Amino acid sequence: MNKFLIIDGLNLVRRIYAAIPDENDMDSLTDRVSVACTKLLRIHHPTHVAIVWDGDEISWRKQLYPDYKKGRKPMPEPLAAGLSALQEHLKSLPIQSIYAAAEADDVIATLAMKTAKAQGEAVIVSTDKGFSQLNHPRISQWDHFNQQYLNIAELEQKLGVDRNQFLDLMALAGDSGNKIPGIAGIGPKSAAELLRTFRTLATLFSSLSNLGAKQAKKLAEGRDMARLSYKLAQLQTDLPLNINLRDFRVNGPANTQQAE
């Protein structure tokens, strides 16, 4: 069975970079990233591996909602200046790069789902909880920094909803980290309570007459924003990727791919 290790490039690199005392020490960063990647290969024994990077194009989410990810700290200048050299160095490892047109997340999600549907196993290396929406028994998520798989049961308990309600929760309450708005006046706790009662957004919005007037008004006025937020939070899993799985076989020929 194929096992595809899919590394969220900037998620890994930026976390490692943040722990380096000297922000200009790119040699140390390169060494630490190389060690991390080698460790990932040793732990997971994949048949295939890729590291996916964000591209420079404006994402469709930003075009749909200009405030998406607004206010995020930009990449530190030393890292931005040294990233190309780091990516070039990684070619010396048996880890091939894929460059997304815009956001890496949709490419990662598509790779994972295509692998799972082909009866393979996909392991996503990232601390981004957004990947938890990929509800498939052959997709898992590895937190390199805590050296453990994402525990979905713990996340469900923390959020107060089932996994299949994660997107509905973000549609109602938003996601402050990505500046996904949600509905004004509906926080995570009240959103979870609503979903425990009504289970889905569709049922909730068809049952507003069962709610108090104030809450029903918030939901009615925020319905369009909830739909937008759901769309922003939902990962694309069917992108047309111009890649060949053979190119990412461990110990295969070095190659760099551009995702379309």
From Swiss-Prot:
Q: Which GO terms describe its molecular function?
A: 5'-3' exonuclease activity; 5'-flap endonuclease activity; DNA binding; magnesium ion binding; potassium ion binding
Top-level taxonomic group: Bacteria
Q: Which residues bind Mg(2+)?
A: D105
Cofactor details (free text):
Binds 2 Mg(2+) per subunit. Only one magnesium ion has a direct interaction with the protein, the other interactions are indirect.
Give me the segments passing through the membrane: none
**SUPFAM superfamilies, per the entry:** 5' to 3' exonuclease, C-terminal subdomain, PIN domain-like
- Asked if Heme is a keyword of the record, the answer is no
Enzyme Commission identifier(s): 3.1.-.-
User: What sequence ranges are listed for the domain 5'-3' exonuclease?
Assistant: 164-259
Q: Which GO terms describe its biological process?
A: DNA replication, Okazaki fragment processing
For this UniProt record, the keywords arranged alphabetically read as follows:
DNA-binding, Endonuclease, Hydrolase, Magnesium, Metal-binding, Nuclease, Potassium
Question: Which PANTHER family does the UniProt entry name for this protein?
Answer: 5'-3' EXONUCLEASE FAMILY PROTEIN (PTHR42646:SF2), FLAP ENDONUCLEASE XNI (PTHR42646)
Explain the purpose of this protein: Has flap endonuclease activity. During DNA replication, flap endonucleases cleave the 5'-overhanging flap structure that is generated by displacement synthesis when DNA polymerase encounters the 5'-end of a downstream Okazaki fragment.
Which family does the UniProt entry place this protein in?
Belongs to the Xni family.
Name of the featured protein: Flap endonuclease Xni
- Which species does the entry assign this protein to? Shewanella sp. (strain MR-4)
